[in-house]
Regions:
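Conserved beta-strand termini and adjacent loop/short-helix elements that scaffold enzyme active sites
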Residues: 3, 190-192, 231-235
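A C-terminal junction/extension of Radical SAM enzymes
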Residues: 213-235
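Short, charged low-complexity linear segments at domain edges
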Residues: 1-14
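Conserved AdoMet/S-adenosylmethionine-binding subsite of the radical SAM
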Residues: 52-64, 73-204, 210
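Glycine-rich, highly charged phosphate/nucleotide-binding loops
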Residues: 44-54
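Conserved strand-to-loop "acid loop" that flanks and positions the catalytic carboxylate
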Residues: 70
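Canonical Radical SAM [4Fe-4S] cluster-binding loop centered on the CxxxCxxC motif
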Residues: 11-46
Length: 235
């Protein structure tokens, strides 16, 4: 687990303290946090007491706590930790996830103010990300997460896609991905940056320009009849 004491960009409209969880059930070729793929020895973990104590120290300076990864949903104990943070401090909590563990999301949702889901591509290409699940199971899990998030009104919902051209190569694929995005979500297209990418292929790959991404977002809004589709510009 890692820690960024103060973040102005990770939790929209909040000054947040950010904790990273190591370990991930995917191996996205474009990932810039590949150092978090594997779980480190337990002696390197941040303790629950440290996290609670650190948040308490920062309450005068922050108005949010964010948990990212790696993949947060691999840690069932995060549910009780987030519950304690919410009940003890009354502060807003956000998590990032890939949405492949809907049962975890169902349990943690009551304590969240914000959830961000990374939808990578269409389910048939999740094998390219090192996902061991068959396409049908990926579909089922992403749809279950979508339905959970559509039914609740407790947390703001963000979906986002890193626009790696090999995995999102057409409007058709992008619009198919919309089937797995809740109606109440804001959806961001994020520019793929080859620097520090995990795979050699991704390091050498071209990126979409910001102009191309803006056109894609505009076309996706037109085709899907959704208006909350944007390009994230601070990357």
């Amino acid at each position: 687990t890692g820690h960024v004491q103060t973040s102005l960009v990770d939790f929209p409209e909040k000054i947040a303290t950010l904790f990273f969880f190591s370990g991930c059930n995917l191996r996205c070729p474009y990932c810039h946090n590949a150092s978090l793929f594997e779980v480190p020895p337990q002696e390197k973990w941040l303790s629950r007491d440290y996290i609670i104590s650190d948040i308490q120290k920062r309450l005068k300076f922050i108005d949010g706590v964010s948990f990212s990864g790696g993949e947060t949903s691999l840690y069932e104990e995060l549910i009780d930790l987030v519950k304690e943070i919410k009940e003890r401090f009354g502060i807003d909590v956000k998590i990032d996830s890939n949405g492949l563990k809907p049962k975890f999301i169902e349990k943690i949702l009551p304590y969240l103010s914000y959830i961000a889901i990374d939808i990578k591509t269409t389910p048939d290409l999740y094998g390219e990300l090192g996902c061991k699940l068959p396409k049908k199971e990926v579909e089922q899990k992403l749809l279950a997460t979508k339905e959970l998030l559509e039914k609740q009104a407790n947390a703001k919902v963000e979906y986002r896609t890193t626009m790696y051209p090999k995995l999102v190569e057409s409007y058709e694929r992008l619009c198919k991905m919309a089937d797995f995005i809740p109606e109440n979500a804001v959806y961001y297209l994020q520019r793929f940056i080859c620097d520090n990418a995990y795979s050699a292929e991704a390091k050498a790959a071209d990126s979409y320009s910001m102009e191309q991404l803006e056109r894609m977002a505009m076309e996706m809004r037109r085709i899907t009849k959704r208006d909350k589709i944007f390009v994230r510009t601070y990357l």
